[in-house]
Amino acid sequence: MFPDHLSDLFSIPQLFGYVAFAFGVGCFLQKSDLRFKIYMAIECVAYVVHFWLLGVPTAAASSAVSLGRSLASIRSRSPWVAAFFIGLAIVMGVWLYKGPLSLLPIMASCIGTTALFFFSGIRMRLLMLVGTGLWVVNNILSGSYGGTALELVILTTNCWTIWRLRRDSVSTLT
């Protein structure tokens, strides 16, 4: 996981990881579901490039599917569209399978798709938290410095935003 040389921290693949980091944190700070999905789409673009350059094709493919599903979920809540993205993630996972590590991004993608199409607000973010845990493990094992940092910060940021949404909903009831 740790770089052999300091220059590895500033390599092209890692720079894309840091861009994903910035947009990922911005994503999970959003209380608006629409802004959440837009930031997530931009994060996914950076992740596709990051993982492709790191040589982790299942994570790159999963991020590409996540990009498509993030954009689609802005316009649609259709179970058929969700099923398409879940099926696509599974097909890509089978096609690019290289071992157990390959399953983590695919599972995270399926969970994220379910969250984005079938839930909103706190429930959507709670399910995204499960996917975040899978990405933490994937990124550690893949050697993604920016990705690991991102997911750990997202874990914290998402919990904080869930707390803020919960606090806001309680204050509107009183």
Please name every model-derived segment.
Residues 1-174:
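Alpha-helical membrane-protein topology signature
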